[in-house]
């Protein structure tokens, strides 16, 4: 594939996203809420329709041609996902509804059966609730103890503090790869290496990295990795869990029912092979097949191309926001190193929801709230924040429109100039 020129990336792909070709309140839609969910290219939408119009049947359960075609398409995606993250085998890819379900699968199947009173789980203060609440539930049941890595002076993962938390009691390190609030890129490879030296297992939440960065689970050497399809151009209702094959083999099923069995008797059952023993019931067939189309789309663009273009956008966004004195920005400045294509902020004297409502009047979609990171916001003494998050179909011109709307919002709520 010929590498796309970075400045032309958005211009090349925007025509693939029908939803972007609309107006909101008389203004062109500027979609800057990609950390919540991405938009879907036409190729993904067409794959959904093709399945329902041509191949709609249950998988693994029929000899007729519709079922055969559906099964072949469904299982082919497992190979694509494995290749996308450089897993050793498609047997290491488990379909889930989303990353939340994937984390809960590990928490209940592995955590409940391997953790005991006094064992320690290390996570961070920046975690999404989906990578915190399940482990709180496990800790409450098993007596395990949660330990939290704090932020450094750049409001990033404090590696030195992490090192002080590791001990022979550490059994699990579960961390977000990229914070959906701070935008910091955590050193997953180094975290995994240090955790393994202490004898702990490692789970990586890749929801914010899988859509934006090349991923290599063998290089990271994590034991599990989770991601949601809807953040990487796929439909809602589909995600995946990667797990090292030998670890998944040792884990009992999370759900029971059809598909996950080998044989069933009146008094017992035997489980099926990997990865099907974790996939009870009729799966999200159409969504999984469409996930494959999304993976194809991202692969064709090139994850390095996507990342490089977004780096340019991130610097442009951060530079513009940094010139507004009323803002309190969260997370590391990109001039200090790699960070994700998002910016969370608060405006002095304004509620984040008011900011989001005002820029929406100009057709600009951003997120307001706590972004499922309430504990992190409490550290900042903030009830929430506004967040603008980018993807490869966004442009500098859209960032300019957002900055203009934000500045107009600040002027609207202020009788005269003010500073923090």
From Swiss-Prot:
Protein name: Probable cysteine desulfurase
Biological process annotations from GO: cysteine metabolic process
Entry-annotated residues carrying N6-(pyridoxal phosphate)lysine: 231
Cofactor(s) this protein requires: pyridoxal 5'-phosphate
Protein role: Catalyzes the removal of elemental sulfur and selenium atoms from L-cysteine, L-cystine, L-selenocysteine, and L-selenocystine to produce L-alanine.
Active site residues per record: 372 (cysteine persulfide intermediate)
Record-level Gene Ontology MF annotations: cysteine desulfurase activity; pyridoxal phosphate binding
Record keywords: Pyridoxal phosphate, Transferase
Top-level taxonomy: Bacteria, Bacillati, Cyanobacteriota, Cyanophyceae, Synechococcales
Gene name, Swiss-Prot/TrEMBL: csd
Residue ranges that the Swiss-Prot or TrEMBL entry lists as coiled coil: none
Any Pfam family matching the protein: Aminotran_5
Top-rank lineage group of the source organism: Bacteria
The enzyme's E.C. designation: 2.8.1.7
Membership in a protein family: Belongs to the class-V pyridoxal-phosphate-dependent aminotransferase family. Csd subfamily.
Catalytic activity reported: (sulfur carrier)-H + L-cysteine = (sulfur carrier)-SH + L-alanine
InterPro entries associated with the record: Aminotrans_V_dom, Cys_dSase_SufS, PyrdxlP-dep_Trfase, PyrdxlP-dep_Trfase_major, PyrdxlP-dep_Trfase_small
Record bears the keyword Transferase: yes
């Amino acid at each position: 594939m010929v590498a796309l020129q970075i400045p032309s990336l958005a211009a090349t792909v925007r025509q693939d996203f029908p939803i972007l070709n609309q107006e909101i309140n008389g203004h062109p839609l500027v979609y800057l809420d990609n950390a919540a969910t991405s938009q879907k290219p036409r190729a993904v939408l067409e794959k959904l329709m093709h399945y329902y119009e041509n191949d709609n049947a249950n998988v693994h359960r029929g000899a007729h041609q519709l079922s055969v075609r559906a099964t072949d398409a469904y299982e082919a995606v497992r190979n694509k996902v494995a290749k996308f993250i450089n897993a050793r085998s498609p047997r290491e890819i488990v379909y889930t509804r989303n990353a939340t379900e994937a984390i809960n699968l590990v928490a209940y199947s592995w955590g409940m059966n391997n953790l005991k009173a006094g064992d320690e789980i290390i996570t961070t203060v920046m975690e999404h609730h989906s990578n915190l609440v399940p482990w709180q539930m496990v800790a409450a049941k098993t007596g395990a103890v949660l330990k939290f890595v704090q932020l450094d002076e750049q409001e990033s993962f404090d590696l030195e503090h992490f090192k002080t938390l590791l001990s022979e009691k550490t059994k699990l390190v579960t961390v977000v790869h990229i914070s959906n609030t701070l935008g910091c890129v955590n050193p997953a490879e180094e975290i995994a290496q240090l955790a393994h030296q202490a004898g702990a297992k490692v789970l990586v939440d890749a929801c914010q990295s899988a859509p934006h960065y090349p991923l290599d689970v063998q290089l990271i050497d994590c034991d599990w990795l989770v991601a949601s399809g809807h953040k990487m151009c796929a439909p809602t209702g589909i995600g995946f869990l990667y797990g090292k094959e030998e670890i998944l083999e040792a884990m009992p099923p999370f759900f029971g029912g059809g598909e996950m069995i080998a044989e069933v008797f009146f008094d017992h059952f035997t489980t099926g092979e990997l990865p099907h023993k974790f996939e009870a019931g009729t799966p999200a067939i159409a969504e999984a097949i469409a996930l494959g189309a999304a993976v194809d789309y991202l692969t064709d663009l090139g994850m390095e191309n996507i990342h490089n273009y977004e780096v340019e956008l991130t610097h442009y966004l951060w530079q513009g926001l940094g010139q507004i004195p009323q803002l309190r920005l969260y997370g590391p400045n990109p001039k200090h190193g790699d960070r994700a294509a998002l910016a969370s902020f608060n405006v002095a004297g304004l509620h984040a929801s008011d900011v989001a409502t005002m820029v929406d009047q100009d057709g600009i979609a951003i997120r307001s709230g706590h972004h499922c990171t309430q504990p992190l916001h409490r550290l900042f003494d903030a009830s929430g924040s506004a967040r603008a998050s980018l993807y490869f179909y966004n442009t500098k011109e859209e960032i300019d429109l957002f900055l203009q709307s934000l500045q107009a919002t600040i002027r609207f709520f202020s009788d005269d100039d003010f500073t923090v």
